[in-house]
Each structure stands twice: as C-alpha cells, then as structure tokens.
Amino acid sequence: INPKKDKLDFLVNLTNDAWFGKSSGPYQHFTATRFRAVEQGLPAFRSANTGISGIIDPYGRVINKINLDVSGAIFSPLPKKIKETYYSKVGDLLFFGVIIITLLIMFFIKKKKKYE
C-alpha cells in the first residue's frame, strides 16, 4: 500500500475467485479484504467474478455485498476514510519487533540454562 496514505481515499480488490469453486476460499478472501480496510482505515471495494463482491467501511463493517455465484451490481456512496491507524503508520515493524524480542528471550534463557 502506498505509504502516502493522505492521497488514498479507498482500497480496491479485483479478483478471480472462480478457481476456488464453492470452497471456503472466497469467504477467506472477502474477510482478508475486511482486515485490510480496518488496518488502513480506508473503505474497500471488492469485485470478484464468481466470488463475493462488496463494499466495506473502514471499521470492517459490510455496507453491501453480492453473495457467491450471484451476478449483480452495487451502487453505494463512498464511505469516508478515518484517521490514520496505528498499523498504517508502523506496518509490520510491530510484528518483526515481537519476533526479535521473542528470539532474544529464547537466546538468553538457553544461555542461562547452559551455565547452570
């Protein structure tokens, strides 16, 4: 995602979910789009050829959707974006920080046991 978030108004997810069939895949993809909307504080529009299409607000709420294997169109005003989120500021640094701290703790525990 573009680091200059102030220039973004919404996220778009165009996808081909046909190869998933009626499995859980399209539902997982739709849920992932909801997470991206919440992470970035931006509304998301998802259009899938046979999967689930919909409009999601920045809080992850589904405004409107078209179910699996249903043709249709959605007309809805653009939900407003919200203030920059913590995740949109730091991204995956938090995740990598937790990994590094965990590895350091494991290293020191192992080193301490070695000298006991």
Regions found by a protein language model. Name each.
Residues I1-E116:
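Solvent-exposed soluble domains appended to multi-pass membrane proteins
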